Amino acid sequence: NYQDWDPVHYLDVAEMTTAVAIGYDWLYDVLAPSTRQLVVHSIKTKALDLVVEEYKTGNADSWAKRETNWNVVCNTGMVLGALAIEEHYPELAKHIIGEAVRYIPNCLKHFAPDGVCYEGPAYWGYTNMYLSLLLKALNDNLGEDFGISEMVGVDKSVLYYMHSTSPSGKIFNFANSGSPSPKPLCPGIPAYN
């Protein structure tokens, strides 16, 4: 019953949509019909309706199109939301998935040639956590990931994480990474290595 999912900071919308979509999928059989309707309505009005306009009018600095972690995180959230309510809004889902697949390479092209994330280890983890969710969801629901996993460097990205971890187990402090503690290896990425 939130008024909105904080569209001013679209990462919040993406994370909320991801959580709600996964919960809706996992709990569908035990949700009351009224709760299902609320979830479908919320995903559509608080996330997907907003992204349609962003794809249409957003410039290169738009979260949907930029070359940073925001692109993968936000587009993944929208794809998961679209897949969750696809049976109710198939054309909307098709449009969102198509646009997300079109723009996600804007970020991932920077993984070429050897999987390095220019934003540093912390954002590597954030980006790849969502990338692994995206690849799994696309493959499970649509039977393909539209070539995203085949982009140059994506298959080597796990090596970047391994090489940016020091012998002490701590992440080297560079780029946008200041964590003194190691981050756990993103669980989904080894499947794509």
Task: Give the predicted meaning of each segment.
Residues 180-193:
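Aromatic (Trp/Tyr) and acidic
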Residues 1-170, 177-178:
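Aromatic-lined, polymer-binding surfaces characteristic
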